[in-house]
Amino acid sequence: TGNLGEASIGLNLLKQKKQNLKSAEKICLKRFLKPEINFLFSQDLSKIANSCIDISDGLMADLNHICEQSNLKAEINLDNVPLIGNPITAITWGDDYQLCFTIGSSKLKKLVEISKKHKIKITNIGKLNKGKGISVLSKGKKINIKKAGYNHFNG
């Protein structure tokens, strides 16, 4: 759901103590300082999703939890990920309080209804296959991601 990268930009703006923010910068700062969680959307989504996780520790780190628990490999198309700023930072940084979920194709119509009802932006960024881990593709080529996201034990 939503855009990735806004919170990391918001944190950088806060660190820089930047004044006279543009409207897009104000949104990023708000995403970092006062993230919004749509509980009603989450409740409706829980009725049709196969799995779901908030990606507050970063898309890569949290999607990996889904992969480990389902014994499947995720393939992300980076070109489809709605993001702001540096693409690698956007998918590895935390604090974007968005959801990553999996859903069967038979539930897509219901998903569209739910997203419209709650005015939540949803995007198909990839798929699950047999295997382990996560591969990230950009323009059809696999790219290497060194940092996976926030780790509560290592920081």
PLM features per residue range, with description:
Residues T1-G155:
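Helix-biased detector of long, well-ordered alpha-helical tracts
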